[in-house]
Amino acid sequence: VKQITTAFCAALVAAPLLTGTLQAAQFTTAAEVKPILAVTKANWISVREFNGQDLLYVTHLWAWRCGLNEIRIGINGADPEVWPLPPCHLDQAAPNGILEGDGDPYRRYPLKSIESVRIEIVYDDQTGESLTVNRLGQPIGN
């Protein structure tokens, strides 16, 4: 039975390879990035104190931006505002890669001024998710 099961599993793996139907996911659609962003909400933003300032990073969201239409960020209860996303680089092997010309995935604020951050994302299928976190990235008031 073990040999039959092993042979069956090997055939399931080999068939797409032999027919050329196995392709790597590019993570360029909402369907592909939603599951990832759903389980990585704690990483959506990061606040870092550096050089006498708070730096608010959205690097994680930029890394999955090809499945997004928009991100909005609100600081300390302010209405969320649109943060531009760099383009999806469909001509590259890693379309979500952050290239030198894409700009910085952060903004500067006065030191210790960020207490809470509201993050809203809109996927390319027009669905959305939101999250409010404290400066440590821990969810609050959702």
Model-identified regions with their sequence ranges:
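Surface-exposed, short loops/turns at beta-strand junctions within beta-sandwich domains
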Residues: 106-115
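Short acidic/polar inter-strand loop motif in beta-rich domains
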Residues: 122-132
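Bacterial N-terminal signal peptides
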Residues: 9-19
